[in-house]
Protein backbone atom coordinates (compact mmCIF):
# COMPACT_ATOMS: atom_id res chain seq x y z
CA UNK A 1 0.00 0.00 0.00
CA UNK A 2 2.96 2.32 0.61
CA UNK A 3 3.87 2.19 -3.10
CA UNK A 4 0.28 2.98 -4.01
CA UNK A 5 0.15 5.99 -1.67
CA UNK A 6 3.62 7.41 -2.28
CA UNK A 7 4.26 6.54 -5.94
CA UNK A 8 1.15 5.57 -7.88
CA UNK A 9 -1.34 8.13 -6.58
CA UNK A 10 1.12 11.05 -7.05
CA UNK A 11 1.82 9.81 -10.59
CA UNK A 12 -1.90 9.72 -11.41
CA UNK A 13 -2.52 13.12 -9.81
CA UNK A 14 0.41 14.64 -11.74
CA UNK A 15 -0.45 13.16 -15.14
CA UNK A 16 -4.24 13.33 -15.12
CA UNK A 17 -6.81 15.95 -14.21
CA UNK A 18 -7.76 14.80 -10.74
CA UNK A 19 -8.94 16.43 -7.55
CA UNK A 20 -6.18 14.99 -5.36
CA UNK A 21 -7.48 16.03 -1.94
CA UNK A 22 -8.85 13.52 0.57
CA UNK A 23 -12.46 14.52 -0.01
CA UNK A 24 -12.22 13.47 -3.67
CA UNK A 25 -10.04 10.39 -3.24
CA UNK A 26 -11.86 7.06 -3.02
CA UNK A 27 -10.65 3.47 -3.21
CA UNK A 28 -12.47 0.24 -3.96
CA UNK A 29 -11.93 -3.42 -4.65
CA UNK A 30 -13.32 -6.90 -4.36
CA UNK A 31 -12.15 -9.98 -2.45
CA UNK A 32 -8.54 -9.29 -1.36
CA UNK A 33 -8.88 -5.92 -3.11
CA UNK A 34 -11.89 -5.27 -0.89
CA UNK A 35 -9.82 -6.10 2.18
CA UNK A 36 -7.04 -3.79 0.95
CA UNK A 37 -9.57 -1.01 0.30
CA UNK A 38 -10.89 -1.34 3.84
CA UNK A 39 -7.31 -1.34 5.15
CA UNK A 40 -6.44 1.75 3.06
CA UNK A 41 -9.47 3.66 4.36
CA UNK A 42 -8.49 2.89 7.95
CA UNK A 43 -4.71 3.18 7.73
CA UNK A 44 -4.55 6.10 5.29
CA UNK A 45 -7.67 8.05 6.21
CA UNK A 46 -5.75 11.25 5.57
CA UNK A 47 -5.62 10.17 1.90
CA UNK A 48 -8.95 8.35 1.37
CA UNK A 49 -12.34 9.64 2.51
CA UNK A 50 -14.40 6.80 1.07
CA UNK A 51 -14.00 3.14 0.19
CA UNK A 52 -15.91 0.27 -1.33
CA UNK A 53 -15.15 -3.22 -0.08
CA UNK A 54 -17.05 -5.79 -2.13
CA UNK A 55 -16.78 -9.28 -0.64
CA UNK A 56 -13.78 -8.21 1.47
CA UNK A 57 -11.69 -11.11 2.72
CA UNK A 58 -12.11 -10.08 6.36
CA UNK A 59 -11.79 -13.71 7.40
CA UNK A 60 -8.05 -13.59 6.62
CA UNK A 61 -7.21 -11.80 9.87
CA UNK A 62 -10.32 -10.57 11.68
CA UNK A 63 -8.52 -9.80 14.94
CA UNK A 64 -5.89 -7.58 13.30
CA UNK A 65 -8.53 -5.84 11.21
CA UNK A 66 -10.72 -5.27 14.25
CA UNK A 67 -7.73 -3.79 16.08
CA UNK A 68 -7.04 -1.46 13.16
CA UNK A 69 -10.67 -0.32 13.14
CA UNK A 70 -10.37 0.44 16.85
CA UNK A 71 -7.19 2.50 16.65
CA UNK A 72 -7.54 4.20 13.23
CA UNK A 73 -7.34 7.99 13.19
CA UNK A 74 -10.56 8.74 11.32
CA UNK A 75 -11.73 12.08 9.99
CA UNK A 76 -15.41 13.05 10.06
CA UNK A 77 -17.29 12.14 6.90
CA UNK A 78 -15.52 8.83 6.31
CA UNK A 79 -17.77 6.59 4.17
CA UNK A 80 -17.66 2.83 3.59
CA UNK A 81 -19.70 0.54 1.34
CA UNK A 82 -19.26 -3.12 2.25
CA UNK A 83 -21.09 -6.22 1.02
CA UNK A 84 -20.85 -9.93 0.45
CA UNK A 85 -23.00 -12.50 -1.33
CA UNK A 86 -25.17 -15.05 0.44
CA UNK A 87 -23.71 -17.82 -1.77
CA UNK A 88 -20.04 -16.92 -1.48
CA UNK A 89 -18.71 -19.52 0.91
CA UNK A 90 -19.83 -22.82 2.33
CA UNK A 91 -20.09 -21.43 5.88
CA UNK A 92 -22.67 -18.70 5.33
CA UNK A 93 -23.55 -18.47 9.03
CA UNK A 94 -19.91 -17.90 9.99
CA UNK A 95 -19.49 -15.34 7.19
CA UNK A 96 -22.66 -13.54 8.24
CA UNK A 97 -21.53 -13.40 11.86
CA UNK A 98 -18.04 -12.13 10.98
CA UNK A 99 -19.48 -9.57 8.57
CA UNK A 100 -21.98 -8.35 11.20
CA UNK A 101 -19.23 -8.06 13.83
CA UNK A 102 -17.04 -6.02 11.47
CA UNK A 103 -19.97 -3.76 10.54
CA UNK A 104 -20.76 -3.18 14.23
CA UNK A 105 -17.13 -2.34 14.96
CA UNK A 106 -16.99 0.10 12.03
CA UNK A 107 -20.17 1.82 13.18
CA UNK A 108 -18.75 2.40 16.67
CA UNK A 109 -16.09 4.58 15.01
CA UNK A 110 -18.59 6.90 13.35
CA UNK A 111 -17.94 5.70 9.81
CA UNK A 112 -20.93 6.23 7.52
CA UNK A 113 -21.52 2.59 6.59
CA UNK A 114 -23.76 1.03 3.97
CA UNK A 115 -23.62 -2.75 4.28
CA UNK A 116 -25.44 -5.44 2.35
CA UNK A 117 -25.72 -9.19 2.24
CA UNK A 118 -26.52 -9.73 -1.43
CA UNK A 119 -29.24 -12.38 -1.88
CA UNK A 120 -27.88 -15.07 -4.20
CA UNK A 121 -24.60 -13.19 -4.60
CA UNK A 122 -21.47 -15.19 -5.36
CA UNK A 123 -17.74 -14.49 -5.10
CA UNK A 124 -17.41 -13.46 -8.74
CA UNK A 125 -16.98 -10.49 -11.03
CA UNK A 126 -20.47 -11.08 -12.45
CA UNK A 127 -21.99 -10.71 -8.98
CA UNK A 128 -19.85 -7.70 -8.05
CA UNK A 129 -20.80 -5.93 -11.28
CA UNK A 130 -24.44 -6.03 -10.19
CA UNK A 131 -23.51 -4.22 -6.96
CA UNK A 132 -21.98 -1.20 -8.71
CA UNK A 133 -25.15 0.94 -8.58
CA UNK A 134 -25.40 0.44 -4.80
CA UNK A 135 -21.68 1.08 -4.37
CA UNK A 136 -21.66 4.28 -6.44
CA UNK A 137 -24.77 5.58 -4.71
CA UNK A 138 -23.04 5.17 -1.35
CA UNK A 139 -19.74 6.71 -2.44
CA UNK A 140 -21.30 9.71 -4.15
CA UNK A 141 -23.97 10.88 -1.71
CA UNK A 142 -23.47 13.91 0.51
CA UNK A 143 -22.68 13.09 4.13
CA UNK A 144 -24.66 14.88 6.81
CA UNK A 145 -22.74 15.18 10.07
Could you tell me what each predicted segment is?
Residues 1-145:
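Non-catalytic cap/lid and distal C-terminal segments of serine-dependent acyl enzymes
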Amino acid sequence: MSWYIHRFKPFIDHNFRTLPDREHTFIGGSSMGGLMSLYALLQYNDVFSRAAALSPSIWVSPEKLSGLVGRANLAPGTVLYMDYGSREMGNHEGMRRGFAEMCSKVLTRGIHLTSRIVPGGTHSEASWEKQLPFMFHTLMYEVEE
